[in-house]
Amino acid sequence: MSEGTIRIGIGGWNFPPWRGVFYPDKHPQAKELEYASRAMTAIEINATFYGRQKPKSWQNWEQVAPPGFQFAIKGSRYCVSRSKLAESADSIANFFGQGFEVLGPKLGPILWQFAKFKRFDRDDIAAFIDLLPGTLGGITLRHAIEPRHKSFDDPAFFELCRARNIAVVLDDSDEYPAIEADTADFAYARLQRMSEDVLTGYDDAALDGFAARACEWRKRGDSYIFMINGAKVRAPAAALALRDRLGV
């Protein structure tokens, strides 16, 4: 069995504090995605959590990003910010109707970030998972669920995810539990404890640890590792430092 691909990236690309730090001075804002998609191998799009994006935007992003690059897409808040996830069928259909299948092979996983108050309810979560499409426009979809309540650290939840090849997102966070489970043929991690006092966001020991973990994930399939929160200004440097350690 061949090893999987490790993709490392950041959340979004339009972040003013990155200008002059990650992006060169006076770099055109219109070309920030072009720059970021060549420095990283994946980007997590957060704007889709708040609303649909225009078909023209998806087409443009597909054209700008290089071959081999992938976008992870955050599922709409209207799908996940509710007490009964089983009732989100219409919102899920609306989310998948915005046209991002035009990304083709540049379409990465769909991230479903549950509300921090959402507790594990087997019937509700099973019904929600049943609503998630397996394909879109001929593309096989990958789904990743980010549970942010400790009640999801439950074999019953892992079993539901494993049955649909859904990854359980690993959070490195001061606020949310780190729930790790082998439930899919890919891994998804969101690293959220970067410090502004450390130029690379995380210190050497932490980055070495993440690199070792990524090497283990690679043995079973692809992995997606995003530097997301904490001192976001350090996210690109953290991602590049991890890429350098892994040679990817």
Model feature map: region roles:
Residues 1-248:
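Residues lining hydrophobic/aromatic ligand-binding pockets adjacent to catalytic sites
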